[in-house]
Curated annotation (Swiss-Prot):
GO CC entries: extracellular region
Subunit structure: Monomer. Interacts with human CDC42.
Cell location: Secreted
InterPro entries: SopE, SopE-like_GEF_dom_sf, SopE_GEF_dom
Family: Belongs to the GEF (guanine exchange factor) SopE family.
Signal peptide: none
One BP term from GO: actin cytoskeleton organization
Pfam families on file: SopE_GEF (PF07487)
Record-given protein name: Guanine nucleotide exchange factor BopE
An annotated Gene Ontology molecular function: GTPase activator activity
Protein keywords: GTPase activation, Guanine-nucleotide releasing factor, Secreted, Virulence
pH dependence (record): Active in pH ranges of 3.5-10.5.
Length: 261
């Protein structure tokens, strides 16, 4: 069973075989990055499918209503929606860490795939965050930022390709463990809390927790690379945002000067 983000649910898929028969002395080909990401989501989908199936209606935790918000009865409500949502996100992180940390450490191939997927997610999220912000339109800042971001991703050893001189990782997308954390949190808190704006505001926190979870489970070398890449991306964002602000001021100054002439 595999989670399909387009439909927000799980679908049954025929499990593909990744076994490759090779002759002695021949190099065994590496599975494509897309197949690797599919394997991660397949594992997550199987676990969550079991979680949902085993949750019988009569065993669901009781709910209490407080200030118009419905909270899961296993948690003592405070009336602060954001605090309650944070509690459920933290609980989801604990559950995912309990399930995935041993697997990342014991299954070298799965650990590598999660590591590369997390690096790709950091790349994609930074690119989208920067390029979709109207404040970064000024000058030629966006292409320069993407090029610098690609160089930083290349330095980590991620598989990818140059597109018009800019490096792009092969598997850019969402961190699969962040997806699992969010799905578990949705289940824990219920639809009413999950629909509140405070939950959307906490998504950067949930993404950060997913990165920290992976970093804590990885060997030291990969953990350090992950942390350093995240710090590099943050530095690049800050640097190019300042450049965009400067370019915007220059453009406004030139426009005002032309109007006054």
């Amino acid at each position: 069973m595999t989670y399909n983000p387009r439909i927000g649910g799980f679908t049954h898929v025929k499990q593909a075989s990744f076994d490759v028969h090779v002759k002695r002395g021949e190099a065994q080909p590496r599975t494509s990055f897309a197949q690797q990401i599919k394997r991660i989501f397949s594992k997550i989908g199987e676990t969550l499918g079991q979680l949902f199936r085993h949750r019988a209606p009569d065993s669901a935790p009781g709910r209490v209503r407080l200030q118009g918000v419905r909270y899961v009865g296993s948690y003592r409500p405070t009336g602060d929606a954001k605090q309650a949502i944070r509690h459920f996100v933290d609980e989801a992180v604990k559950q995912v860490a309990h399930a995935r940390t041993p697997e990342i450490r014991q299954d070298a191939e799965f650990g590598r795939q999660v590591y590369e997927a997390t690096l790709c997610a950091i790349f994609s999220e930074a690119k989208d965050r920067f390029c979709m912000d109207p404040a970064t339109r000024a000058g030629n800042v966006r292409p320069a930022f993407i090029e610098a971001l690609g160089d930083a991703a290349r330095a980590t050893g991620l598989p990818g390709a140059d597109k018009q001189g800019v490096f792009t990782p092969s598997g850019a997308g969402t961190n699969p463990l962040y997806t699992e954390i969010r799905l578990r949190a949705d289940t824990l808190m219920g639809a009413e809390l999950a629909a509140r704006p405070e939950y959307r505001e906490l998504q950067p926190y949930a993404r950060q927790q997913a990165i920290d979870l992976v970093a804590n489970a990885l060997p030291a070398e990969r953990s350090n690379t992950l942390v350093e890449f995240r710090q590099t991306v943050q530095t690049l964002e800050a640097t190019y945002r300042r450049a965009a602000q400067d370019a915007s001021r220059d453009e406004k100054g030139a426009t005002n000067a032309a109007d006054g002439a």
